[in-house]
């Protein structure tokens, strides 16, 4: 009998012999593997599994017609090994890259000879070890095993895969696994939702709102009762997705059953409310949970409230937050000072910002590149892009080196004002200083060239990004899909979308809205409708923006009936029809010379409490001019002023056109 097939020797681990040196045919030898302390000698088994032909046979989707007799004898010699020994061996093999192939071969060996049950528990243990170490994507692992290992997959296995996918920051894979659980009528556990939310929260970009709503709907459908940690993750996720109303509802639900979310979730919600300008609600939440409660506010909580005051340009209240922090013994950090500096910059108080920088240094908080990037962003938003050079000089005078974030803001500043030469100079400078561009850098640069009409250069930059160590993200693909759509390069659009999915990226609401917009503007209405249907099939809810893009596309071509059908579909999906959509519908009727229907939309607005804006009245005047009802144009203009709507340049131009035609007709 070959040495590799000898039965295991039942010896204490310190007397365990090593397998003969020549017993393997693979580079992954058992002597190079750390074997766990055990009453059993696994060396012969590992030597056998290290053979490439054996490993290929075990992991093949098609089982062999017959199993060699020596393998049967080897398996029989391990029939008395208890389950916990197999688990210990598997964990140890999974701990090293060198022994990982043996772990892959061991599982089907155990399955083939029925040596350990349940096998899914072993596979779940291996998945957990790999996800903790981050050395292998879980879906790749699943594909490496024959379907017979778990066919159909068990809930334990799917939940383990879901957790591993989340740990690997692959929410798309995790969502697919959640769908598989539902397809097989398995009940996901709370941990599955927590892992999935963690993967969404651990990304740089905010979670996609449609995905969160889908996830919450699935959780409610399963009738699982969230615990405090899961409520906290849900509140944090919706807050980061800029959906404070949904986060507030979740907070109320948690409190109704006596649960208190973690302080970081409350802080995230305060920050979201402040960002939305809802400072009164942010203040109330801060008082309820921190000042009136048992939890003492920390720096991050104060910063969240401070962000709201900066958002509404309430400098007095912002300065009071700093005073209160001092009175409560809470030390301000760099983010605190950067928010105040940002407030001063946005108010045009550059000298006050410089004084605060000095105070910051006096308090032992050295300003970083981030603080200066906030100053630069403030000037950018006020249109003072030329001050970018002054900020850079001040930064260098303070001994602070620009980092990636600062360069990203600088590139964005130049890009917004079509100073593409300066943007490329900043890009090249950061590379010269050894700072590698990240996905934000590339996205900003590519988008700036797209908007500046430099489409060829944008495509070149995208290719450079592909070749770099920074793979394109969802936002990158959205930018390129929009660029190719504007050029009506439809094969390129489809290829870009396919490539995006192949990279494991999930098309988000912006992706679908972009597709609907570019297809609609080019008259490819079938493709636009198909995108909406595909989105619904993926469990995502079309946004009002998407419907508006399609209504507007129909309106531009005077296809009023099609536009009206889209509005009806929008209402059927439970979405509120906005002024923007109704204005586009008026335009569609106007282009189709259907003035009566155009004015019926105006009546619909009034009956439903929607206030017509200047675009509404301007579009109606344009419709009247198109059907040569010039005498009614001044009447609509007068009605606009009476309603309190201030006319703009286009409205006045429409009035002049109407009066000009009236005068011409009278002369004639």
Swiss-Prot record:
Q: Which PROSITE patterns match?
A: PPR (PS51375)
Q: Where in the cell is the protein located?
A: Plastid, Chloroplast stroma
Q: Give yes or no: UniProt keyword Transferase.
A: no
Record keywords, A-Z: Chloroplast, mRNA processing, Plastid, Repeat, RNA-binding, Transit peptide, Translation regulation
Question: Which region of this protein is its transit peptide?
Answer: 1-64
Task: List the Gene Ontology MF annotations in alphabetical order.
Answer: mRNA binding; single-stranded RNA binding
Query: Source organism's superkingdom?
Result: Eukaryota
Q: One GO cellular component from the entry?
A: cytoplasm
PPR repeat residue numbers: 154-188, 189-226, 227-261, 262-297, 298-332, 333-367, 368-402, 403-437, 438-472, 473-507, 508-542, 543-577, 578-612, 613-647
Q: How does it assemble?
A: Component of a multisubunit complex.
Family, per entry: Belongs to the PPR family. P subfamily.
Cite the PANTHER family for this sequence.
OS03G0856100 PROTEIN, PENTATRICOPEPTIDE REPEAT-CONTAINING PROTEIN
| Stated name of the protein | Pentatricopeptide repeat-containing protein CRP1, chloroplastic
Gene expressing this chain = CRP1
């Amino acid at each position: 009998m070959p040495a590799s097939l000898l039965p295991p020797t039942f010896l204490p681990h310190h007397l365990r012999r090593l397998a003969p040196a020549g017993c393997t045919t693979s580079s992954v030898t058992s002597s190079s593997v750390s074997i766990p302390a055990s009453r059993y000698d696994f060396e012969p088994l590992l030597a056998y599994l290290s053979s490439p032909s054996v490993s290929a046979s075990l992991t093949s989707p098609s089982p062999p017609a017959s199993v060699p007799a020596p393998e049967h004898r080897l398996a029989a010699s391990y029939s008395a090994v208890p389950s916990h020994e197999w688990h210990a061996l598997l964990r140890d093999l999974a701990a090293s890259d060198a022994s990982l192939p043996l772990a892959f071969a061991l599982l089907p060996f155990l399955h083939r000879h029925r040596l350990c049950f349940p096998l899914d528990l072993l596979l779940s243990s291996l998945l957990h070890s790999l996800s903790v170490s981050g050395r292998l994507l879980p879906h790749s692992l699943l594909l490496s095993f024959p379907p017979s290992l778990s066919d159909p997959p068990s809930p334990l296995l799917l939940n383990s895969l879901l957790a591993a996918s989340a740990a690997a920051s692959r929410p798309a894979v995790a969502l697919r696994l959640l769908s598989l659980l539902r397809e097989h009528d398995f009940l996901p556990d709370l941990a599955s939702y927590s892992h999935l939310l963690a993967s969404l929260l651990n990304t740089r970009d905010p979670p996609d709102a449609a995905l969160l709503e889908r996830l919450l709907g699935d959780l409610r459908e399963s009738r699982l009762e969230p615990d405090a940690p899961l409520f906290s993750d849900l509140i944090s996720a919706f807050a980061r997705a800029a959906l404070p109303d949904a986060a507030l509802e979740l907070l109320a639900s948690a409190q109704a059953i006596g649960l208190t979310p973690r302080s970081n979730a409350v802080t995230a919600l305060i920050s979201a409310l402040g960002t939305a300008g809802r400072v009164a609600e942010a203040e109330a939440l801060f008082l309820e949970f921190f000042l009136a409660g048992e939890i003492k506010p920390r720096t991050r909580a104060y910063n969240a409230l401070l962000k709201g005051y900066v958002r509404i340009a309430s400098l007095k209240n912002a300065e009071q937050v700093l005073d209160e922090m001092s009175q409560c013994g809470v030390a301000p950090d760099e983010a605190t000072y950067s928010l105040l500096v940002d407030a001063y910059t946005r108010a045009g108080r550059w000298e006050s910002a410089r004084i605060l920088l000095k105070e910051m240094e006096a308090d032992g908080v050295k300003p970083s590149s981030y603080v200066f990037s906030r100053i630069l962003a403030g000037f950018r938003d006020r249109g003072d892009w030329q001050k970018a050079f002054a900020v850079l000089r001040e930064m260098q005078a303070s001994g602070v080196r620009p980092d990636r974030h600062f360069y990203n803001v600088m590139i964005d500043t130049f890009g917004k004002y079509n100073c593409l030469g300066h943007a490329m100079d900043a890009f090249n400078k950061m590379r010269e200083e050894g700072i590698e561009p990240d996905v934000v850098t590339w996205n900003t640069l590519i988008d700036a060239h797209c908007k500046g009409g430099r489409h060829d250069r944008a495509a070149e930059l995208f290719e450079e990004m592909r070749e770099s160590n920074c793979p394109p993200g969802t936002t990158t693909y959205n930018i390129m899909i929009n660029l190719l759509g504007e050029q009506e390069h439809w094969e390129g659009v489809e290829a870009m979308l396919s490539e995006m999915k192949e990279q494991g990226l999930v098309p988000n609401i912006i992706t679908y809205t972009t597709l609907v917009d570019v297809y609609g503007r080019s008259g490819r209405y079938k493709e636009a409708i198909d995108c909406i249907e595909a989105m619904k099939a993926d469990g995502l809810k079309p946004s009002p923006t998407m419907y508006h893009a399609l209504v507007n596309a129909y309106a531009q071509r005077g296809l009023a009936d099609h536009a009206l059908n889209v509005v009806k579909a929008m209402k059927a999906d439970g979405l509120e029809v906005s002024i923007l959509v109704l204005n586009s519908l008026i335009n569609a009727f106007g282009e189709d010379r259907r003035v009566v229907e155009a004015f019926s939309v105006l009546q619909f607005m009034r009956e439903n409490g929607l206030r017509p804006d200047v675009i509404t009245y301007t579009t109606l005047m344009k419709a009247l001019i198109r059907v040569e009802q010039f005498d009614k144009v001044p009447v609509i203009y007068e009605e606009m002023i009476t309603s309190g709507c201030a006319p703009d340049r286009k409205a006045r131009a429409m009035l002049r056109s109407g009066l000009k035609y009236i005068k011409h007709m009278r002369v004639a």
